[in-house]
């Protein structure tokens, strides 16, 4: 079920197994075995940060469980896609684990993909690199990335700044490989628009936080259902970098959104909100929650397969209307 007027740059071995050109975005403390399995079985790509597993041994167990779970479907499922954070202590060990499992796709973030590309290519794995600027795109292409994930304004958590229309078209002028749009994709209509814009896939994160299979708390899910676009706050206060967070969660944590320190450094933000000491403030991602502009599309807590079903119907209708 893809845009009829644009060929996908994805390899056929992957594209043919997708019901939708969609990645359930890898989200810290949210994406785990159950969510990834449900999404892959429903026909979309399920992604997760390797850092969500507490150790490399747990990561190995997670991958084994996901592989077994999707195999039980009895037919080819959509791929699962680990997200490898480059600048983290477990990078080499996590990379080696992914190589042992011969995963089909990996997303790299927070740093150049260069150190990961060759080992992953050696086992036939596609490498997608997170980028937030044209310079990032150039560097990722030079490093050998197979695909680019464009982090744009409206993405939840650590976010981008660029307008998605301008960013996608500028990247398409220099790169003909797979492009993924990340930020503000609310439903199947937006997914269809991303395909027409020139993307091969799109991220959807916020919608899947509210899925029953996510690792989010019930309170987090309820807040997503109760929130709209106007409840998203762009702030540097908790990470030292721009992040899209739920304003109601900041208030619930006892802070005044109008009086946050927007000049804080990454190190100081980590000290205050990273949860490493008792003197700090509320823990980011645990007590202060992220969401993207697509939060207005979260209307209920449902299963991941139900979300994929809804998006698929909207996606199909969007192209039927466009063809009329």
Q: What is the meaning of each model-derived region?
A:
Residues 1-178:
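Active-site entrance/lid segments in N-terminal catalytic domains of soluble metabolic enzymes
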Residues 30, 185-186:
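Residue-level detector of alpha-helix initiation sites
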Residues 164-180, 186-324:
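Conserved active-site-proximal phosphate/metal-binding subdomains
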